[in-house]
Each structure stands twice: as structure tokens, then as C-alpha cells.
């Protein structure tokens, strides 16, 4: 089974999602260059690190499917929260749903 993924490819809405999360006060690091199924962003928010896979909600559902590598990674991840988001509001909601403290 190939789990290499598509390193370097980013969804059109990624920069808008990053901007929205930073305006919220989150620390955001893009990991989209890594590939191997690793989600696109590391998001730090009030003591929690969230892995965030970005899909472009403007595209048809068939074009938003997880790659084999992404699905494998998310199914086997044993760390903190890992979510899939399609737009800025979903990203903000995911961050607000996962907070530990007021750091």
C-alpha cells in the first residue's frame, strides 16, 4: 500500500484558513510540504495542538476525498485532535471545540 501522499500540493482555501486561525490567536504551521499523509496544518490553541487536514469545500465531494495516505494517517493517529475542514468557519469551530486552558 502506497502512503506517500502528495507533498507540496495545497488547497486553494489554505491561505484563507491560516489567516482566519491566526486572527483568532492560534499559532499555525503549514506542513503541506511533508506529505506521507500528514495533515496540512499544525494549529496551537490554548494548550492544545490540533492536526488539520484542509479540503476545498468549493470543490465537488468526489474531489475532496482523503488520499489513501491521509486516510491511513488519520485512522492510525494516536495523538491529540486531528480534524478535516472544508472552510474557514469549520476550522475556527474545530479550534474552539478543542481547548484545554486559557494560555
Residue ranges and their predicted role:
Residues 1-103:
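Catalytic phosphate/metal-binding cores of nucleic-acid and nucleotide-processing enzymes, i.e., regions
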